[in-house]
Amino acid sequence: FSGRKLDTTKWDYQIGTGSQYGLNGWGNEEAQYYTPKNVFVKDGYLVIEAKKEEKEGKSYTSGRVRTMKQDGSPLFTTTYGRIEASMSLPEGNGVWPAFWMLSADESYGTWPLSGEIDIMESRGRLPNRVYNAIHYGQPWPMQKYTSSMYKFPAGQKTTGFHEYAVEWEPGVIRWFVDGNMYYETSSWWTMANDAVEPFEYPAPYDKPFYILLNLAIGGTYDEYRLPNDYD
């Protein structure tokens, strides 16, 4: 990343609580309000900073960016390939950083029918491990997911810089940390509510996806934990 601000020809902000999509708390009962002020570039790195401050009914502010404009038009999408980032993650209760992908056009329907690829997620209170997932199946609440965990070698933590990557090919998705593949799957399906059979495999992972980076606070992912005052 260059300069001091987000390059909005490549990335754009998502703002608010998710209420504009009918998902207050971004569908996970999260405790933050996303603002552009919590995202900046420093020394060549993109920084997302969470703060304890009240904003429009939320107790924290933080940041979320994606390779899609606020109006929903794409800035960057990909179908297949290797997607990677070198990241240093925060430690502490209630912090939930994520590096992930969503369908650019929801070809198969709204979440989770068109899929979600979680390249990396972390629970800040467990700084020696990260997680991945794919989401698919039928409409909520009958959705499915497949997930795995990577545990760092002794002496390493998520607070150091590590490379997180996914390799996405027709019919297979693989996850890597620091070049080490730790999980792969070819098992998924997706089906509309009124359908008799699923969409043709490898749906939904055969359409363009865009990239997201965010730092959430609280919510369902780690049982509603919130940061301690000293975190």
Residue ranges of predicted features:
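GH16 jelly-roll
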Residues: 2-231
